[in-house]
């Protein structure tokens, strides 16, 4: 019966996804171990995470990225609910993880760590386009993992760096960001799992609120509430002052190089407020996003603002990087202000590019939210060449 309901919910929007879902359902029925894994996930969630989440707005719609770019490429609100609220989402994530490991045995991109005074930021390419991160206090030999979706890849980096994992920072609940919490927290018994209690993050042990600070050695990491992509989405700001270097923003699915995440669980006004939280940070802040979407996003930005020279220069650099499969992160927030359309809703040039409408400086912010909503609609329709 469940297979019929799932297939019906997806009818007309992705027959192939329905077949995948039926396969997962039938496989899970025959596989008792999968059910045990599900019960284990539920039993280890924090008390806060056991509460029933608020219902999603009926206006929400999930539109897929181009094929192969998104672990949640099945479409529809029904699928989103299954993905985030049931064990089917975990099984789907495991399937995507196996495929990515086979396709990219050394990761989807070549990354380079950034070294500061006793602090190292190490990007780890996982799945088909995700990034996890290790933030390391090199003097103390302590590490913090951000969004460790592939525990095998993250553990390999931990062993290579010869550090002790003491904390996991989860930006949000989606499996492509939280899927490694179980294995890593079991392997590293003293490891704490941080995140928002509103998001149902698996294996959460230490709930965080807006402006809470996580301290690990010399690392001072502040949580900033940025709802919109999910209700409890957080970004993490590593303070650069203790090591006399630039601050680092680990943005999850809020902000990408020249892009932003979809508003799955909120409104345009909510997402605008979250993006404004980032805009308040300094220009030299390094942006470490959750996905490698740079080339696609800059292509869309060129459609919106074709005469933006900052975007053109960045696109040329990104294309050279991607020809060699090199990572494009980090960028800086100063750069993003110059070419990221989702951070430029206050700019008259962008409003004029999208046509007439209310002024971008209205006191209630309504017109900026409308512009953001229109940008999101156009981005979802955009296809990269």
Curated annotation (Swiss-Prot):
Protein's UniProt keywords contain Mitochondrion: yes
Q: How is it modified after translation?
A: Undergoes cleavage at the N-terminus.
Q: Which GO terms describe its molecular function?
A: hydroxyacylglutathione hydrolase activity; metal ion binding
Necessary cofactors: Zn(2+)
EC number of the protein: 3.1.2.-
- Which sites bind Zn(2+) 1? 172, 174, 229, 253
Report the GO terms under cellular component.
membrane; mitochondrion; nucleus; plasma membrane; presynaptic cytosol
Q: What else is known?
A: Mice overexpressing Pnkd infused with angiotensin II develop greater cardiac hypertrophy as well as increased cardiac inflammation and fibrosis, compared with angiotensin II-infused normal mice. In these mice, Pnkd overexpression promote nuclear factor kappa B activation.
What protein does this entry describe?
Probable thioesterase PNKD
Q: Which organism is it from?
A: Mus musculus
Tell me the name of the encoding gene. Answer: Pnkd
């Amino acid at each position: 019966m469940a297979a019929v309901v799932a297939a019906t919910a997806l009818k007309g929007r992705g027959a192939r996804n329905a077949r995948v879902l039926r396969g997962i359902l039938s496989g899970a029925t025959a596989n008792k171990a999968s059910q045990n894994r599900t019960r284990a996930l539920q039993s280890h969630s924090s008390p806060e995470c056991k509460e029933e989440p608020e219902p999603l707005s009926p206006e929400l719609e999930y539109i897929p990225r181009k094929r192969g770019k998104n672990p949640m490429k099945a479409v529809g609100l029904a699928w989103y609910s299954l993905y985030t609220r049931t064990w089917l989402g975990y099984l789907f994530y495991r399937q995507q993880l196996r495929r990515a490991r086979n396709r990219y045995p050394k990761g989807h991109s070549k990354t380079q760590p950034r070294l500061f005074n006793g602090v190292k930021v190490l990007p780890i390419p996982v799945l088909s386009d995700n990034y996890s991160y290790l933030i390391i206090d090199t003097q103390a030999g302590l590490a913090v993992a951000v969004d460790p979706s592939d525990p095998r890849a993250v553990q390999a980096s931990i062993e290579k760096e010869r550090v002790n994992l003491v904390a996991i920072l989860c930006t949000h609940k989606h499996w492509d960001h939280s899927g490694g919490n179980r294995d890593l927290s079991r392997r590293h018994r003293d490891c704490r799992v941080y995140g928002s209690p509103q998001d149902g993050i698996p294996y959460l042990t230490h709930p965080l609120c807006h402006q809470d600070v996580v301290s690990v050695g010399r690392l001072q990491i502040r949580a900033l509430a940025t709802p919109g992509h999910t209700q409890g989405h957080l970004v993490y700001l590593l303070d650069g002052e203790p090591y006399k270097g630039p601050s680092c923003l680990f943005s999850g699915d809020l902000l990408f190089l020249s892009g932003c995440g979809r508003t799955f669980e909120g409104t345009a006004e909510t997402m605008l407020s979250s993006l404004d939280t980032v805009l308040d940070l300094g220009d030299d802040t390094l942006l470490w996003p959750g996905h490698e979407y740079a080339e696609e996003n800059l292509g869309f930005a060129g459609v919106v603002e074709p005469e933006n020279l900052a975007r053109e220069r960045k696109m040329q650099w990104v294309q050279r990087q991607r020809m060699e499969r090199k990572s494009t992160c980090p960028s800086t927030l100063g750069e993003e202000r110059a070419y990221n359309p989702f951070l430029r809703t206050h700019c008259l040039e962008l409003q004029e590019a999208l046509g007439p409408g209310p002024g971008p400086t209205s006191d209630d912010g309504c017109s900026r939210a409308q512009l953001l909503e229109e940008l999101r609609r156009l981005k979802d329709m955009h296809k990269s060449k």
